[in-house]
Every structure is written in C-alpha cells, then in structure tokens.
Amino acid sequence: MERLLSCAGTGTLYLKVTIATLPDDTLLDIFDFHVRNTYIGGPHGWPTLVHVCQRWRNLVYASPRRLDLQLCCTQKTPARKMLDIWPALPIIIDSGHSVDQVSPAEGADNVMAALEHHGRVRVISLDKGVSSPLLRRIASTLQEPFPELKEVWFNSASSDGSAPALPDSFLASAPRLELLRLDSIPFPALGKLLFSASHLVYLYLEGIPHSGYISPEAMVSGLSALPGLKSFILEFHSPRSRPDQIIQHPSSTRVLLPALTYFRFKGVGEYLEDLTAQIDAPQLCDIGIMFFNQLIFGTSHLLKFIARIERLKALSRAEVVFSPDFVQLRLAPRAQPGPSNDARLSLSTSCRESDWQLSSVTQFCTSSLPSLPTLESLYVSEHRPTKLPHGLDDIEKAQWIEALHPFTAVKDLHLTRELVVRVLGALQELPWEGGTNMLPALQSLFIEGFEPSESLQESITQFVTARQLAGHPVALHHWKREIW
C-alpha cells in the first residue's frame, strides 16, 4: 500500500515523501476529486477511502458536506442491512445497472426499505422501467413528507399508457424538489404539485398518456408558481391529447417564466398555440418542437412567442432534414464562439409522405416563424433508406418552390446528392425573372461529393448557367456533409 500511495522527488535535493505526510486539507482535495469522478456508492467511491486507514476513515466521516457523502441503494442492494451499517447519510435510490439480477419482489422490497428513511432520501431515479405494482407502492409512500428529496425520475415499464395514475397528494410534502421527470406515467393532478414545488428547476413530462392529459390552462397555472424553472419538456403520447377549443387570452395576462432556457414539446399544434399564447420566456434559447402528423395547423401565437425571444433573432444557419418518419427544420447561429452561440430552434412534423413533408416545411416558414433576415446558410439533406423516384412532377416542383421562397437572405445553399436534381430542377422551371426572385441573395452552391453523376452535372450546369445569364452568378463548391 505504501508503495502505491507514495511519490518520489527527482535528484538528491528531495526526500521520499509518502501520502501519509500530507495535511488534511490536501487529502480532502484529493478525496473530493476521487468522489466526484467515480460512481456514487460504487466500489471505487468514498466507501473505498474509509477502508484504507483509521485517519482516512475519520477524515471522511468528519467531512460529509465537503465530500457530499451519499449512500446509493439500487434494486439489488439489501437496503435494510446496508443502511444499518453505514452512517445516517443522504440516500440515493437508483435503478442500478443490473436490475435483472434480482427478482421483481426482492427489488421492490429493497426500494421500499430505502424509502422508509423519509428524512434522508435525496434522489429517486428509477429510469429502467418501474412496474405498475411497484409504482403504486412508491406513489403511496411519497404522499408522506420527504423534506430532503430533490430529484424524482420514474420511467414506466409500460409505454402503452397503462401505468397507474399518480395520486393527487403525490410529492405534496417535498418542499426542496428541484427535478421531476415522468415518462409514460399519468399525473392529472400535476398542477396541484407545482404550486407546492416552488424550487423546481427541471420539469420533464414525456410520453404523457391520454389518461394523464393536462389542459393548457392548468399547465400555465402550475408554471406560474415556478420562477426558477430552467428546463421544461412536455411531450404527449398521441394526438388524442388536445384541447376541446382554443381560448382567446389577452396578452396582458401572459405568465412570465424568467429563468426558462430549454423547452421541448411534442403534441398537436392547437395545444402549443394555447400554451404559447399564455406565456413569455425571454431567456429561452433552445426550443425543439415536434408536431404529430398535421397537414394544416395554425400557429400564429407560436410565431409571436418566438418573435419575442431576443436570442432567437440572430439565427444565421438553417437545415431542412427529410427522414423516413419526419421532416425537421433546424436553425442555429453561425458556428463561432460567443455567449449567444447556444441558441437553437427546431420544428418537426411526424409524417412519411414526401409531399406532406414539403408542405410542412412551407408551413414552418410561413406560419410558425418570423421573417428570417439574418439567415444566410441553408442546408437541405435527405436521410432515407430508399431513394425517391427520379421523376419530378409538377406538384412537387411547385412545393419545392413554395418551400424555398421564404429564404430570401440565403447566400450559401448546401444540397446533398439525393436532392440536387429535385431542388435545382424545380428552380429551373421558373422564368428568368421569377428564377432570380427565388433565393435572390444566393452566391454559392455547395454540392455534396466530389464526382457528381452525369444527370447531376447536367442539372448543376443548367442552374449555374441560368443564374449567370440572369445577372445573378453563383459559384459552385463541393462539400462534405456536416453534423450539427
């Protein structure tokens, strides 16, 4: 042990010094680094330190706050035995990495044994899938006071909406709660909890079953009690979860979310319209929205909501991504260091048909987003297992023209090989005057790959020549597809 825990100087001026001669403060710095870089409660965490020698043991136990000492109980941890042996430290209840190594009954008993220590439980993270029977037992217990509880994460083992609903008084006595994450678990009385959880910073509601539907009005009412909320995810399981009617809300009644910087939504446009009509989030800089399959959706309130966010007014790059199951429009600032470089905005629709996807892009640009005067780079890419047919009918040509029309400030257009013929073919159908009104600021065309096929080369040549003759020359470049 001494050989492993020693360090020798160089030359004859330095004597050999063992770690035992280091002062307590230095040892604590080393211990702190060790504890924060190892899995809590694992074999290489702080329990290893207390078995080295009596001095280390005393030093560790005398510094529980400095070292943030915690006990980790998993479903395979014999909680009653372990908690009787170790000091009365804060408890983390975690799914662990090998849930299948214990029977469901034994795992449930271990979790419930740890929950008996109401005043010590700090984190409950059961993200590997909680069975309905265990969820009922936990939910019943969590109606009791848990004064130190800060984080709760439950992921239902059933993603079909069959998980039991959480009771009205769930977590009603957890005043220090900072993070709540529920996946595929209905909680119709969420609004009641939010009024008592004023310290909540992270609220993640994913895969919300229809049985757990929360109206936009109830959601906004609950959010009004969370001035420190920084991250918010609201994702419904199906398009069945929608408001019965859109209510007109006067702008003077909007709820301010001053700390919110991250927002994710999945659902129908009507719900998002009702929600964004009632809130303001001036610091928001990362938005991700996924609509269920909707060909027509009005999002005027979403447009106004985005327009009120200062950090989203300087987005200079856009990418349209066509995938097998969805289409996505992503916007970001120019890739350069700076405090505003973390701004992100993405709009997606879950649909498969290419004409529906093109229509969605048009609606994103015309109905959901304010004008884009700072958008100078446009990337259009396709990620499909099968290629689109080579033919380009009149309907698709018109859809491409309509989808590209809002990008009036774009100087650089990047196209993947799969889309060159389709995009340039559509633009070439326009008369000379109309053709230059499309992408009027375009200066450079970037084509993926270095050896375009004969058909690609023909489309490229015709487009570049047409722009040259119209007095709007375009430089041709090759590029390698980037990952944002």
Predicted regions and their residues:
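Leucine-rich repeat
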Residues: 1-484
